[in-house]
Amino acid sequence: MDEQGRLMQARGVGIPGLPIHGGPQTLTPHPMHEPPTDNGEPRKQDIGDILQQIMTITDQSLDEAQAKKHALNCHRMKPALFSVLCEIKEKTGLSIRNSQEEEPVDPQLMRLDNMLLAEGVAGPEKGGGSAAAAAAAAASGGVSPDNSIEHSDYRNKLSQIRQIYHAELEKYEQACNEFTTHVMNLLREQSRTRPISPKEIERMVGIIHRKFSSIQMQLKQSTCEAVMILRSRFLDARRKRRNFSKQATEVLNEYFYSHLSNPYPSEEAKEELAKKCSITVSQVSNWFGNKRIRYKKNIGKFQEEANIYAVKTAVSVTQGGHSGANSPTTPTSAGSGGSFNLSGSNDMFMAMQGFRCTARGRSGQMEGGKKLSPLRLSPRPQKDLAVSTLTPRTELFILCAPSVYQTRLFTWTKPLPRLTPILWNYQGEGLWKSTLPLPPSLPSN
């Protein structure tokens, strides 16, 4: 600084805010030409004046600063001053260039960019949040009609996050560009007085961008956190509690309650159920395992559900067996799958000889206001009873008074002996009896 000041004063060159003594044609005597003193008072006074003039530059008006800058640019010693500054910078610039190296891209910023691209938040609008939601839904096993509303909410919220992100990113880029343009214009203006190369301007722009990158990283990090929270609330939560379709649940429940004494389907049955429900065999196995656990923990809660499926089964059997006549019909042959149909619109009952079975369930209201209490089957015929399915060692669903559809649940107390079921059809005052062949589900020995 002292050397530059002496050179400028020796050559009559001034700087903005520093007046040139003696006019443009006169040179100020160099301090070295003055008589030396023991304490160096003239040199200290000269440096103090220069510093004082520099401090007063900020107090100058714009017109005064422009006038002094114009006077400096028009001074005849300006080229000499500029060449001296270039020589000084050439000596000191080597160490500066060697110390500055290109900094690598921040890996954290790269991870944030990759995540925003994968979620459809960053990048061009090619489906955006809708494409990301569709991809996530496909990965989670598809979208059922029950979850379509939730997926719509997810897409809407992801679209809002994308809009906010791009709006804030646009503000950030605008502020960064404005500041960079201002600095570049300032450096170009200063390059008329002091040597500034284009590479130095580029280096300064890179420094500005690195300073602004902290703001950009904060914006991207907060956006990624918002996307992760949204995923945890919608897609990830749904993936953990994926539900089967209503039709698949109906098929599985019907099989479970029709095999309640032994709800362990074979591999063939699992494959058939999986095909009907459009799911995998492992999903069928998991469903039955969970269903058995829930049923054992709370039998009373699932009792009503069992009654509902019993009514559905009984109604389907009785409706399928209607022939339009009052005479009884013979059930299907041995390939009927373990059940036989009871036809006719009249009230019917089934009495089994040689065994008893206990009944449990709630008493219901029969036709005519007569109470129906838990009862035991006996060889004697009882009217107003209808049987839907009969299998050994399984729970027997009996529909009491078909016109009322009151369901009762019976359980075998001992293995069934060899017996012949008798169908009693109550018609008026008389009984008409017919012997039926044993269904394949009943023991033959």
Curated annotation (Swiss-Prot):
InterPro entries: HD, Homeobox_CS, Homeodomain-like_sf, KN_HD, PBX_PBC_dom, TALE_homeobox
DNA-binding feature ranges: 237-299
Ranges where the record places region PBC-B: 131-236
A GO CC term assigned to this protein in UniProt: transcription regulator complex
Domain of life: Eukaryota
UniProt-annotated location(s): Nucleus
Biased composition (Basic and acidic residues): 31-44
Polar residues biased stretches: 319-332
Domain PBC: 42-236
Region of interest: PBC-A: 49-128
Region (Disordered): 13-44, 319-338
A GO BP entry: embryonic organ development
GO molecular function terms listed in the Swiss-Prot or TrEMBL record: chromatin binding; DNA binding; DNA-binding transcription factor activity, RNA polymerase II-specific
Entry keyword set: Activator, DNA-binding, Homeobox, Nucleus, Transcription, Transcription regulation
Pfam families registered for this protein in UniProt: Homeobox_KN, PBC
Gene3D superfamilies according to UniProt: Homeodomain-like (1.10.10.60)
PANTHER family referenced in this protein's UniProt entry, alphabetically: HOMEOBOX PROTEIN TRANSCRIPTION FACTORS
Purpose: Transcriptional activator that binds the sequence 5'-ATCAATCAA-3'.
Sequence similarity: Belongs to the TALE/PBX homeobox family.
Protein name: Pre-B-cell leukemia transcription factor 2
Organism in which the protein naturally occurs: Xenopus laevis
Phylogenetic lineage: Eukaryota, Metazoa, Chordata, Craniata, Vertebrata
Originating gene: pbx2
